[in-house]
Amino acid sequence: MLTYPPVKKVSVVIPVYNEQDSLPELLRRTDTACATLGRQYEILLIDDGSSDDSARMLTEAAEAEGSHVVAVLLNRNYGQHSAIMAGFSHVTGDLIITLDADLQNPPEEIPRLVEKADEGYDVVGTVRQNRQDSIFRKSASKMINRLIQRTTGKAMGDYGCMLRAYRRHIIDAMLNCHERSTFIPILANTFARRAVEIPVMHAEREFGDSKYSFMRLINLMYDLVTCLTTTPLRLLSIFGSVIALLGFAFGLLLVVLRLAFGPQWAAEGVFMLFAVLFMFIGAQFIGMGLLGEYIGRIYNDVRARPRYFIQRVVRQPETASKEEDRS
């Protein structure tokens, strides 16, 4: 079995978007949890274009004497996964842990992830126990998890939980991928030799509201479908072929019925004909929309614009020099 050297340094990557209320508690609890590891550590917080006071608070935390905080400030909002990738580009640790800023996944779980990674796993995922979310969020999450499992064949139970640990070579492999539509847990699993999940606690959100609106969840679902596989396009072709055959058979049936019962019968069936026609037209629009999603993502990738733009990185001078040496 492949073995890895012991983890000497842990990097915690946290995307932040309008989380000024939770930041003091987040910084305190994360630093306390990392201090118990008995290893070097750093806490990278990426401000994803916040409109509140988050950027200033992160900058002050990073500039404080003896701080383990690194503030990565993006010029605008790029989304959770792009912000995390921006953080990945500045980590210096052997093991990288991602964590949400809303404190629903307690930072106190970090030592358990490090302990599990020490057993030789490339990726350590988590499954939220007693999940404190709305019925809509739970249902959407279950549907997305099943879709991912069927498409990828990777039987992991909770892809939506961002409390995860990745070995350094997994991070380097993901940074070499340049597609704009990225879902980090899935991308990481494509490079992992050994992956495992552990149960973790899930708390109610104490500060602010969820940043995932209904439309953001829909967009995430499209990202998942289009970045995972081209199977929907194949299904679309099969579905179109079935519809064409049914339409041809239905047309023959109408001709036979007209010959058998006369033109009066055909007039009485006009509403059913329109109903079937609208069904076919609706199916065509669904197919065109799905095809448009793929073409739009190809267009974005061909333009080769960066996934994010880092406006400023604030860290302690000694860690800054180490990061420069690594790069």
Swiss-Prot record:
It is an enzyme of class 2 (transferase). This is Undecaprenyl-phosphate 4-deoxy-4-formamido-L-arabinose transferase. Catalyzes the transfer of 4-deoxy-4-formamido-L-arabinose from UDP to undecaprenyl phosphate. The modified arabinose is attached to lipid A and is required for resistance to polymyxin and cationic antimicrobial peptides. It is found in: Cell inner membrane. It comes from Klebsiella pneumoniae (strain 342). Keywords: Antibiotic resistance, Cell inner membrane, Cell membrane, Glycosyltransferase, Lipid A biosynthesis, Lipid biosynthesis, Lipid metabolism, Lipopolysaccharide biosynthesis, Membrane, Transferase, Transmembrane, Transmembrane helix. It catalyses: UDP-4-deoxy-4-formamido-beta-L-arabinose + di-trans,octa-cis-undecaprenyl phosphate = 4-deoxy-4-formamido-alpha-L-arabinopyranosyl di-trans,octa-cis-undecaprenyl phosphate + UDP. The keyword ATP-binding does not apply. The chain crosses the membrane at residues 236-256, 270-290. GO terms for cellular component: plasma membrane. It is a multi-pass membrane protein. Pathway: Glycolipid biosynthesis; 4-amino-4-deoxy-alpha-L-arabinose undecaprenyl phosphate biosynthesis; 4-amino-4-deoxy-alpha-L-arabinose undecaprenyl phosphate from UDP-4-deoxy-4-formamido-beta-L-arabinose and undecaprenyl phosphate: step 1/2; Bacterial outer membrane biogenesis; lipopolysaccharide biosynthesis. GO terms for molecular function: phosphotransferase activity, for other substituted phosphate groups; undecaprenyl-phosphate 4-deoxy-4-formamido-L-arabinose transferase activity. One of its GO terms (biological process) is lipid A biosynthetic process. Pfam families: Glycos_transf_2 (PF00535). Its EC number is 2.4.2.53. Belongs to the glycosyltransferase 2 family. PANTHER family: UNDECAPRENYL-PHOSPHATE 4-DEOXY-4-FORMAMIDO-L-ARABINOSE TRANSFERASE (PTHR48090:SF3), UNDECAPRENYL-PHOSPHATE 4-DEOXY-4-FORMAMIDO-L-ARABINOSE TRANSFERASE-RELATED (PTHR48090).
